[in-house]
Regions:
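Loop/turn segments within WD40 beta-propeller blades
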Residues: 33-35, 41-48, 67, 85-93, ...
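Conserved strand-to-loop turn within each blade of WD40 beta-propeller repeats
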Residues: 54-57, 97-101, 140-143, 185-188
């Protein structure tokens, strides 16, 4: 009986290079140039073979545990590092991403371009879907602010903006799965909790 966790390589991340870019001449440099830096990942809630990987280069890759040698799809829309990718809890094709390029983007996995973009004017460290609704999500930024959206009520603007941290970058956000509470973690190891209003805690859609 094994008493420790063992790592298993699922896929080697390869750079997706635009066709109009020049070829790298040096072989060693070409090898390094061909590897992508992974920043985040998330498994699909409805098909645990499918997962997304966000990269340092701004690309998002759809991968499968059944096909370890290639990407199923590559999504282009961010131009800086992708800090988080999150599948929707109710719709198997929908996911969110956030990036150092100041934006949150919503995607359909069958389309390689974003279907919606939200600009928060500074780096977005994390984004999270609410566990009780398909249209509510929260995000945190390097300025220390917490944003809450509900696409059913307002498709283009946040419903709530609140300073989550004082003089610290907010890095992570998480919904409590039982109570109407959001937790925000910062770069200094601090965690703050916030209670959601009733208008943002409606049941699944």
């Amino acid at each position: 009986m094994k008493n420790k966790l063992e790592a298993e390589e699922v896929i080697k991340l390869k750079l997706v290079i635009d066709q109009d870019k020049e070829l790298v001449e040096n072989k060693k440099e070409a090898f390094l140039y061909g590897l992508a830096g992974g920043m985040c990942f998330d498994f699909n809630k409805f098909d645990d073979h499918l997962f997304l990987v966000g990269t340092e280069e701004g690309k998002i890759h759809l991968c499968s545990k059944a096909y370890s040698g290639q990407y199923l799809e590559t999504y282009e829309g961010h131009y800086l590092a992708v800090y988080a990718v999150k599948w929707n809890n109710f719709h198997p094709r929908t996911f969110l991403s956030c990036s150092a390029d100041w934006t949150i983007k919503m995607w359909d996995k069958n389309l390689n371009r974003p279907i919606m973009t939200f600009d928060l004017t500074c780096a977005v460290g994390d984004v999270e879907w609410a566990p009780y609704s398909s249209t509510v999500f929260a995000a945190v930024t390097s300025a220390g602010n917490l944003y809450v959206y509900d696409l059913k009520q307002e498709k283009h603007h946040h419903l709530c903006e609140h300073p989550a941290m004082k003089k610290a970058k907010a890095l992570h956000v998480s919904f409590n799965k039982v109570d109407p509470i959001i937790l925000v973690g910062d770069e200094r190891g601090g965690v703050n909790s916030f209670k959601l209003s009733k208008s943002l805690t409606k049941g699944p859609l």
